[in-house]
């Protein structure tokens, strides 16, 4: 192809880009180059330009398509030097005549700026205490203060304001520069006294505006967090906040007293600080309506949390800078911090307060412009081109529907639901929908948040391969770097073998990428030093595990919250497979959705099995947040009418809703239409209940009994659902157990028992307690064999892994069985012939059924899903039985634990999403398994008659709960038992020996005393399959990566295990099991 390159660089950037461009193209002028070039060459050129780009870089690349047509491919550097088509302006001026960039829709920007600057001027005055100053000068081990400095700062601010004062009183005193006395210090409420003084936020202690400033002061490091006693105490926030909510610790009387003594004075003695506070106070007095709005500010989530974000970011940034002698009084005796490397005193206290205030003011002006300055993806043909395959043409209708409501979504927000069935291409459709909603000239920015690491990697890979997105367009963030590297190495092996998808033509994948730059200042500098935060914020499209975004609403410590919150404020959000999260994680998920609405994001939920209560609860979370956003950023006085849309493979529709009632009606109508269409399709899965005869026995005996019954059921299922080729018959089956402990014991029993005459069983044990390297190898083999399609018999039998297994025995019938934990339900694109399931919930049954004939049509008419009538917890006599995983609790019990009593026989004839997406009326939660799930979701998500012990999700926006960390602490995200990192490490002297080791505080310690071997015996006609030898995999990986064997094990051999004082048992094929 023929390209034209235009450079608008200046200064040193011009000579640098000339040097690079001269290597690839011929000059056609002083700033113009032209050349024929391949796609690979063009990619290399762009990478080199981006690598050397600086502030004055600006290069546009045009593809000359014909005599009268050219197309802009990309811009590297400052896109403002070109227009949307890549043209260069005729004339330029440095004068900002239109002042267009100064315009924004932030009605509260000035209130936020004043609040933040005032809080910044007081945020660390508590560091003037004798205790803190002594700590700065003590080179020994750091010791926490008896009272944290931000609490002391709040008490000092409270004393200055004075009990009973109005906001006008304390602001006038502060605005009077002549007021330099400290008589007000006698009003200081010291928490070390015998009788504790009232909290600063209790009635008559602080006037309304001062309360808002005081909360910013006390929360600038972490949210106050203390005991809550249900909704009544949450509704009283912030009144209950006391010193213990803010990190006070037990200490002797002398240590406590030192926190309230100020022998070197306070920042009030600094003339520079005093002048700046007077100026800020005067500005607050002159701000029209600010004092009148004071009572509402503290309970305004948008104002308070944007102000807190600015204050935290300014504090983080300025604390990282060297001392600045230009700020504050020379020789001021108090200090705020020390140099991290040398330990010497660094910033003076008045200087620090003035510096944070200065950068708070700058950031308050930067934030409204931030969203316009970040990189976006525009005119990307991968998102806009029409689909050729009939199966996926529904995506075009979804794209058109989203594009039709673009204007309304920009003005009123967007809440969408993608309910398309599995295998219909929801992943790419989600991106197309949000791309259609974006301004076509500016382009799209969105985040795809998923619950599983494996799903995140697969989603990112799908976007890169099918849409041609590069590393600068799409960022993939997952929890573990080792897991990501293993995934990428697997993809590289596939590419070397020619298995990757064929590359599309450039014409189909070309797009404009405006590599925007953050303006100079604290935000850019802070992000420049924080590469993880930079990646999170900069990429136009982000595919990440939801853990990367959760700190936006969940983190109690401010530093962890900054980058995710900025991402949420500047991009739209896809929540993929929302109902895969545990019910205990839904409150945190709802808080994230509420904040997405609060900060102006558009939200798309994607799942085929969304229950009505979950949908209604998340819509209400979004609506309540968007309503606040509209007050501050929308047209004044206009009602909130959120544009909602529903998409599936049959239709797409949209409508506006300002209340959950009308939304719920529209959702029910769409779901009813969807079910009517689904019922016209032939069934692919049918279930059958299997009565278990093993109740009341100890688990080892129970598993032996269950293994015998499993053999019979597996043989029956194989007989009805197999693939035959050249006289041999194979089938792929899944045995799903709820928990790993009984799973391993059942695996031992099945292997010891063997298989009946005429059958050969190949058993793979798959769960999360394998070393990472082993689990990755198992998943690689499963991915290869379980990628199925119609009429794939010959290709299936020709696969090397399968052919090798068949050659090893003479039996006609071979069963390849995966015995798995719930990790098999989601995250992998596997296609089984049949399954046997230990029930936990209707949700898990439906999810697992989706793995049967996942990508194949047709159905034999015989049941291909067997459900155990009782689960193992029930057989052991435990109550509640359907929990961990499951929905049963002491507050929500079931009368029976037998599926014969809990499932309607009509459900078995056709296993699909219907029981989940339609809520029966009335509900019978004690006698029906699916009704129990709907009841629990209603109680949690809608606060519909919840038990007294349950905190309903709506409390987050119905009370001032966001002013504390109470709900984040009582309803944490992924609150499972604490896990530690272990690995099997080769001995430093004898690499044949492996040591069980634990990683703590940067070092590995030997834990061989906690590990025992797990016995394994084999019966006739059975063998393990899909399993790998840990040491062989380790040696191969170390060779490929040129790593020392021990280093390789440290990186790729980790396994995360919960605390267990009894230790662990291990077998390479079975994984880790608690020793008992």
Swiss-Prot record:
<dbReference type="Pfam" id="PF21384">
    <property type="entry name" value="Cas3_I-F_Cas2"/>
</dbReference>
<dbReference type="Pfam" id="PF22590">
    <property type="entry name" value="Cas3-like_C_2"/>
</dbReference>
<dbReference type="InterPro" id="IPR048823">
    <property type="entry name" value="Cas3_I-F_Cas2"/>
</dbReference>
<keyword id="KW-0051">Antiviral defense</keyword>
<dbReference type="InterPro" id="IPR013395">
    <property type="entry name" value="CRISPR-assoc_Cas3_yers"/>
</dbReference>
<dbReference type="GO" id="GO:0051607">
    <property type="term" value="P:defense response to virus"/>
</dbReference>
<keyword id="KW-0347">Helicase</keyword>
<dbReference type="Pfam" id="PF21802">
    <property type="entry name" value="Cas3-like_C"/>
</dbReference>
<dbReference type="GO" id="GO:0005524">
    <property type="term" value="F:ATP binding"/>
</dbReference>
<dbReference type="GO" id="GO:0046872">
    <property type="term" value="F:metal ion binding"/>
</dbReference>
<feature type="binding site">
    <location>
        <position position="220"/>
    </location>
    <ligand>
        <name>Mg(2+)</name>
    </ligand>
</feature>
<comment type="subunit">
    <text>Interacts with Cas1.</text>
</comment>
<comment type="similarity">
    <text>In the central section; belongs to the CRISPR-associated helicase Cas3 family.</text>
</comment>
<feature type="binding site">
    <location>
        <position position="124"/>
    </location>
    <ligand>
        <name>Mg(2+)</name>
    </ligand>
</feature>
<comment type="function">
    <text>In this bacteria Y.pestis-subtype CRISPRs do not confer resistance to phage DSM3 or MP22, but instead are required for DMS3-dependent inhibition of biofilm formation and possibly motility.</text>
</comment>
<dbReference type="InterPro" id="IPR027417">
    <property type="entry name" value="P-loop_NTPase"/>
</dbReference>
<feature type="short sequence motif" description="DEAD box">
    <location>
        <begin position="576"/>
        <end position="579"/>
    </location>
</feature>
<keyword id="KW-0460">Magnesium</keyword>
<feature type="domain" description="HD Cas3-type">
    <location>
        <begin position="102"/>
        <end position="318"/>
    </location>
</feature>
<dbReference type="GO" id="GO:0016787">
    <property type="term" value="F:hydrolase activity"/>
</dbReference>
<dbReference type="GO" id="GO:0004386">
    <property type="term" value="F:helicase activity"/>
</dbReference>
<dbReference type="Pfam" id="PF18019">
    <property type="entry name" value="Cas3_HD"/>
</dbReference>
<dbReference type="InterPro" id="IPR006483">
    <property type="entry name" value="CRISPR-assoc_Cas3_HD"/>
</dbReference>
<dbReference type="InterPro" id="IPR038257">
    <property type="entry name" value="CRISPR-assoc_Cas3_HD_sf"/>
</dbReference>
<keyword id="KW-0479">Metal-binding</keyword>
<dbReference type="InterPro" id="IPR054712">
    <property type="entry name" value="Cas3-like_dom"/>
</dbReference>
<keyword id="KW-0547">Nucleotide-binding</keyword>
<protein>
    <recommendedName>
        <fullName>CRISPR-associated nuclease/helicase Cas3 subtype I-F/YPEST</fullName>
        <ecNumber>3.1.-.-</ecNumber>
        <ecNumber>3.6.4.-</ecNumber>
    </recommendedName>
</protein>
<comment type="function">
    <text>CRISPR (clustered regularly interspaced short palindromic repeat), is an adaptive immune system that provides protection against mobile genetic elements (viruses, transposable elements and conjugative plasmids). CRISPR clusters contain sequences complementary to antecedent mobile elements and target invading nucleic acids. CRISPR clusters are transcribed and processed into CRISPR RNA (crRNA). Cas3 plus Cascade participate in CRISPR interference, the third stage of CRISPR immunity (Potential).</text>
</comment>
<dbReference type="InterPro" id="IPR048824">
    <property type="entry name" value="Cas3-like_C"/>
</dbReference>
<keyword id="KW-0067">ATP-binding</keyword>
<comment type="similarity">
    <text>In the N-terminal section; belongs to the CRISPR-associated nuclease Cas3-HD family.</text>
</comment>
<keyword id="KW-0378">Hydrolase</keyword>
